[in-house]
Amino acid sequence: MSQSPIAADDAALRSDVRRLGDLLGQTLVRQEGPELLALVEEVRKAVREGSGAEILAQLSVEDSVQLVRAFSTYFHLANVAEQVHRARVLAEARVTGGSWLARAVDRIDAALKAQTPGHELTKEEIAEWVGAMSVRPVFTAHPTEAARRSVLNKLGSIADLLDDPRNPSQQERLAETVDLLWQTDELRLGRPEPLDEALNALYYLDDLFTQTVPEVLNDFAKEMKRIDVEVPITARPLSFGNWIGGDRDGNPNITAEVTTDAMELQVSHAIRVTIAAMNALRQMLSVSTKIVGATPELSASVEKDLKHIPEFEQRFLRLNAEEPYRLKATAIVNRLAFTRDRHATGAPHVPNRDYANTAELLADLVLMRDSLLAHRGELIATGLLERTIRTIAAFGINHATMDVREHSDAHHNVLKQITGIDGYIEKSHDEKFEILTKFLADDVRFDASQLEALGKKTVDTFVAINNLIDRFGPEAIETYIVSMTKGADDLIAAVVIAQQAGLVSLKEKKARIGFAPLLETVAELRAAGEILEKLLSNAAYRSIVALRGDVQEVMLGYSDSNKDAGIATSQWEIHRAQRSLRDVAMKYGVKLCLFHGRGGSVGRGGGPTYEALIALPWGSVDGQIKMTEQGEVISDKYALASLARENVELTLAASLEATILNRGPRQSKEELAAWGDCMQLVSDSSFKRYRALIQQPDLPAYFYSSTPVEQLGELFLGSRPSRRPDAAGGLDSLRAIPWVFGWTQSRQIVPGWFGVGSGLKAAREAGHSALLEQMLKEWHFFTTFISNVEMTLAKTDLALAKRYVETLVPAELHHFLDEIQAEFDLTVSEILTLTGKTSLLGDQEILARTLQVRDAYLSPIHLLQVNLLKRVRDAGDSADPVLRRALLLTINGVAAGLRNTG
């Protein structure tokens, strides 16, 4: 297995892949005998020559398992080599072309000097935006990375070894790890519990704290200083969020107890890494008062610490008597340990002995910094100490801020019971809004003691949030997200229940959390401005927003709108929703924080992060932005420290640019109107074609028969079920993730492109060819949209899809593939006409070739999957467990080859 599946013109990369392939071949011979390696090569050759299906059909189940494991393992190894290569290339690019942040600040500096009319800038404005900036990637569990943590750990070890060429034992250690990888089961034995998922996220957060964020925030401050803008030492331009343990929408496994347990786990990790950081500071800060002084404030603070911490080790008092910074660092370590113990036992906070919140910890650290700055210690203060302060400001003593999400129906179910209002559920959105806002304004409390189980579970969540904020501070949980928000009343319903739990009270001028509507379907997106207008024009709710610092968060869902309307309409309606939300927020003097619920695949809003952020409507990134980092992409983005740094830095840089350089329209009103009209035509025609496909009564039967989606649940990818609870069968009950998953596995990838060709054709035939070309060159939104569609088309393989259909789908349903093929051909033709290329990715030859060669290795797995799916279905309930295992392994293999699940 020595041929590289990577076509990049880079000797080091090709060498690494060849080397890992050779090691895998040796492992196969060592572990299973030469017959397996011979079979791998025979199948690879046969597939290339078009006769692979015949050979695969004759394989035993056991041989099928071994074969798919071999190909899947090869993809895992190739992916690692690619990651290491990307890290090398990025390191070189940083040296030759500067970092993402450096380039962003260069563009801001150029804008400062240019002072273009209508886009004038001042350093004071920039300083204000930077001081209030908040960029927050939010980790979610679903869709879960298909590979187990045990597999990812082995792959991480291989990456470390590849990155250490001077290690004399490198070859032996690589061989050892590949053997370990082969002997590790790729499949989970059971569905992960929510706390298992939380631990997985904490694995990455720990590494970000220790390896990535200190350097990124240090660089951010340095780059801004280059244009005379100071980033306040305790500013929080970057922080992290977490849904794991808080997202209960459709996941019955998330209870108030699970949320509490997840937060406790998170905080324990945060304190552990913070103590380690303080120990590093303690070791370094050997500054002696025999040589330089210390401020009276620092000395008094140390004295107070010694008074309140009688357990302070005498050894440190003796050895560090003239080293106040070490004494202060030791006191901080002690207070952090007491904080950890307080959380573990539930004991009350003791002032000056443990920390009530992050602000108290930062105050101690700033005291040390100020003292150093006052006593010839500027380089020391702005070195490790400043990096530590900025990092702790980013993570806090909670590591990440947890969001809580629940479906809007859950809140109305509670209110129906506790208010006793006849026909409450049947009332209109406006009627409910009027009733509920009066309850809010009057601070009405209800008796919730007689609630049924589901209602009690919902109320218990709000009680738990209140308790967690009491225990862990205001940064523990900041936002409650209401999914399926169809009207303003859906959000207010959650606020009224929060009022019952003591989280909100207008009489007490208290709002301990904020509330965010999640707009997911096309109808909700189109109503976005109207919903926000109704909320902000209401005095009671506007008071809540004022109590939250005049910031209103709105979450946009990319997945459901795509499943509902197709990619063109989904992307366009999300773009339009952002414009209307921006305008309403500006009207009411509110800072808008948009939370982008983007997935890993293009069909769920995925794509290059930098381009996506730059393509957002002007003024919609007002220094505040959140975006999901979904389970399937976290490993690819954060597994290596260098790649984690790249991802965090480009996200911060793009958000900085979008905030400062995209505050007003770049085009005239007439131009924007013409583009909008043209895009509306593309969207309408695309929507019509997409709906014509998915509304056909037999489409669900085609989808389920031509894809392995029904096996998704057996992979135990996450704690959340793949279907919505209490929903009927068919496509409506299917979540967007398995919808994309199924189409992707069978290489039809309908959610990523279907309908776009019809939309572009309609615009072209309406005489808009020149306008489309202008949009492609000058409109970031349209450029990014077309680029993402082109990438998905390149990954689509309808010749392989035909194998699925001919083998697995009843003949009377084959016409669906004909429809998909026709739209595919049209979309490719329209994209090539628009871009002027002769082939997909024609301007990215290396990437195109990489995908082409990967397909040569993916094809055997696909053909095996088709064969195994047929055998499993033919066997029905009596299917051999080994046969089912072989099938599940093919699903993992395709996910590894395509680098996403759904």
What positions do the PLM features span?
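Often metal-dependent polyanion-binding catalytic scaffolds in large enzymes
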Residues: M1-L436, L454, I513, G606, ...
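Glycine- and acidic
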Residues: S4-A7, L187-D206, A256, E264, ...
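Hydrophobic cores of alpha-helical transmembrane segments in multi-pass integral membrane proteins
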Residues: G25, Q578-Y588, I749, D825-I831
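Carbohydrate-active enzymes and regulators
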Residues: E42, A81-Q83, R103, R107-I108, ...
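Catalytic or ion-translocation cores adjacent to nucleophile or general acid/base/metal-coordination motifs
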Residues: I254-S286, A501-K688
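Active-site cores of enzymes that catalyze phosphoryl transfer or operate on phosphate-rich substrates
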Residues: R342, I397-I492, V496, Q500-L506, ...
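Active-site phosphate/pyrophosphate-binding segments
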Residues: M679-S686, Y690-R723
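C-terminal accessory/interaction regions of large nucleic acid-associated machines
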Residues: Y704-G713, L717-G902
